[in-house]
Amino acid sequence: MESDSVPPSEPFSLIIWMAIMLAINASYYHLLISLVLITLLAFSALISGSEVAFFSITPAQIQDLKESEDKADFRVRNLLERPRLLLATILISNNFVNVSIIILFNFLMNQLLPDSSIQVIAVIYAAILTPILVFFGEVSPKVFANQNNLFLARMTARFFKFLR
């Protein structure tokens, strides 16, 4: 029975084994950390999408924003008046959130798999965390933002106004 707790050496089997071990070892504390990770991933997606949203606004859309009396449009206009500051705010915010995700994920893995080797943790990062961050935190939000730039810019303008 002791051989059941030894992780397999094949990558796919290792991932399945890790998922089973995580489910067995999960507690409310670990589930709470997982919820925080999901929330941070959502923030990363919003922030990442905002970069494309703000900087893909066309001159015609900017003219519409200038003619609008809506408060959200005013905030978007105001943020676009200083594009370098807006870009710096977006990039710093996104880096802060992504680093927080990595630190919290590392903490969670150390709690759930305390005896794992560096190689196992590296496989987890390469096979699980990196694709999740890239796809859900970067690529998908930017595709969405490219097609819904004003919607996302209006939605996140208050947040970036606060951070600025």
What are these regions (language model features)?
Residues 2-164:
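Membrane-embedded alpha-helical segments of inner-membrane proteins
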